[in-house]
């Protein structure tokens, strides 16, 4: 880790601050805004229930276990020693961070991306891309555009969502072959990058 301590944290008194400093800060940053060079996404727009589920999946080998998922294996190692209580505290800590819309990095057709999102993604992720609690589908608004692309490719390539205990990921694996055109994916990601995360 980079030697940064909990002193650099936004809310060092929070129950999840110590684990965030030890396990998350060096890749995801003080404000949870991530680093593209490390393929570490911004976390601040993610729902705490979703964060906790993903951390458990990494810890339990449901996600990040594919031998070709280099970045997922880093998350699996970082999550390995976390208890359910620590995961809940971490999710709460991340949820308390200010939401920041990540900078756009992909040049796509935003208007077409909106149309594609409404036709292909909104049934589960919502027309405003803020997710669907009943379906436990995560928000896509507020995610890094490059992360949306990389995760879609992982679903399509079987690096994510292939584990039988990942019932949500399995749905994405089934749906991912529907979009093979890179321009369409980039347009969707570019559109999502314009949507503010839920406050």
Could you tell me what each predicted segment is?
Residues 1, 77-102, 174-199:
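C-terminal capping alpha-helices of c-type cytochrome domains
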Residues 6-33, 106-130, 199:
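Sequence/structural segment immediately N-terminal to covalent heme-attachment motifs in c-type
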Residues 17, 25, 32-63, 72, ...:
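Gly/Gly-Pro-rich "capping" loops immediately C-terminal to redox-active cysteine motifs
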Residues 20, 58, 93-94, 117, ...:
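Conserved hydrophobic/aromatic "anchor" residues
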Residues 22-26, 66, 89-92:
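Intrinsic, low-complexity N-terminal interaction/targeting segments
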Residues 30, 70-71, 127, 168-171, ...:
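Residue-level hotspots at or immediately adjacent to binding/recognition sites across diverse folds
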Residues 33-35, 64, 96-109, 122-123, ...:
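Inter-heme linker and motif-flanking segments adjacent to c-type heme-binding CXXCH motifs
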């Amino acid at each position: 880790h980079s030697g940064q301590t909990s002193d650099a944290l936004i809310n060092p008194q929070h129950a999840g601050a110590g684990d965030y400093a030890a396990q998350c800060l060096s890749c995801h940053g003080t404000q949870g805004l991530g680093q593209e060079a490390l393929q570490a996404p911004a976390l601040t727009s993610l729902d705490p229930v979703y964060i906790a589920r993903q951390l458990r999946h990494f810890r339990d080998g449901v996600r990040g276990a594919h031998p070709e998922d280099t970045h997922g294996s880093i998350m699996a190692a970082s999550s390995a020693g976390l208890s359910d209580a620590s995961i809940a505290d971490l999710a709460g800590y991340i949820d308390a961070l200010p939401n920041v819309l990540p900078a756009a990095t992909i040049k796509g057709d935003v208007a077409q991306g909106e149309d594609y999102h409404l036709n292909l993604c909104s049934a589960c992720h919502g027309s405003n891309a803020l997710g669907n609690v009943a379906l436990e589908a995560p928000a896509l608004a507020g995610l890094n555009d490059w992360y949306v692309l990389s995760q879609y490719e992982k679903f399509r390539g079987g690096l994510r969502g292939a584990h039988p205990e990942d019932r949500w990921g399995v749905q994405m694996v089934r749906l991912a072959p529907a979009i093979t055109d890179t321009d369409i994916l980039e347009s969707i990601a570019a559109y999502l990058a314009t949507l503010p995360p839920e406050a």
